[in-house]
Amino acid sequence: MHDHLFYTASVHRDNPGALVVQESFSFPRLYLALGVTTMRTTGSNEPYADLYLQRHIEDGRVVGPHINVTAPYLEGAGTQFAQMHELKDANEAREFVDFWANEGAGSFKAYMHVTRAELGAAIAEAHKRRVTLTGHLCSVTFREAAELGIDDLEHGFIVATDFTPDKQPDVCPPGGTQKYFLQVDAHSAPFQDLIRFLISHHVAITSTLPVFELSAPGRPAPASMTRGLDTLADFARLNYLTLRAASHSNPNNHGAEALKKEMELERAFAAAGGMLLAGPDPTGSGGVVAGFGDLREVELLVEAGFSSAEAIHIATSNGAQFLGLLDRIGTLAPGKNADLVLIHGDPSKDIAEIEKVETVFKDGVGYDSAKLIESVRGQVGIR
């Protein structure tokens, strides 16, 4: 539910005009190879490439999962990404949604600098077109977004600005949120009030723990992530290792604490009855790779306190329900799509065995996981 078709890792990624690389060749194969048979892109930098890929997969000309293509980001003024359009006002936000819905986008995503007026207009137009809108927000708080009718919030509470004192309307706090996020008590009245508010407004939360694990020093490298790195082009691996070394050597790095806190808060949200979704977010410093990251997300949900069955349910059935596709996918039942994964092991006893994927069936057709992975070795970061 947070599966991009681009790769961001570069030591130059913060430079003005930096571009992200479209991965229309390698990522669809990797997603399918590791058991992802339906995905949502959750933000596009090359929307026509994503729509083209979607058509070719459905026509059987390209190997990959079924794709819910999310439109380009609904971003306000101040973005750092050259491939993102900056909205001018609420009217343009409505026109943006209308245009991309006509082009074939199946969902929308608001981004960090969007204003409340722009977000509200976009949500209203998206719902008029019967599609969902999610957000990775900063300038708008989670509570404000819920009041406006948003369907889903990405990354969990680690990006929420609700707990940042002196937060100014429609402005992303200049000092970031981590300091205040680490102080949030899952049992406190303010947090419990927020999650009750989100649940009452039917707002889902998408967990993306793997991308935050990248910033947590001292953790052993999981097999899924190590295997993912083997698919990187040489320059992409060098970029990742350089960024990782810089992050982990930073004396002000609180990534391990932040990961643990996010796990705790997501568990509290789900325990209160909230709908938790799952995705890897293959961005950041580049260590989260398509497919491998999806498996790692399930493992991290188990580390957060969910049972293996609960974690798998979050990653499958909950996602299908959110997409409105539970009558076709998300569980195994007569009449549903023949989408299933054959694993050499028992993840219900040891969740790490979820990585031992041998064959993936999509629409009844079996794909050899190892061969798909081998077909893109050394290609991630290039195409």
Residue ranges, per PLM feature:
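Active-site gating/metal-coordination segments in enzymes
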Residues: 72, 77-129, 172-177, 182-185
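Surface-exposed amphipathic alpha-helices with a cationic face
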Residues: 54-58, 119-130, 199, 267-270
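Divalent metal-binding pocket/active-site signature
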Residues: 106-154, 209-214, 258-260
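Active-site neighborhoods of metal-dependent hydrolases
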Residues: 99-109, 114, 159-304, 377, ...
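Divalent metal-coordination and catalytic microenvironments
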Residues: 35, 67, 104, 126, ...
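Metal-associated gating/positioning segment near the N- to mid-region
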Residues: 1-61, 80, 85, 91, ...
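Divalent metal-dependent hydrolysis catalytic cores, especially in the metallo-beta-lactamase
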Residues: 26-48, 65-72, 102-114, 132-134, ...
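Acidic, glycine-enriched loop/beta-strand segments at the rims
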Residues: 289, 307-312, 321-357
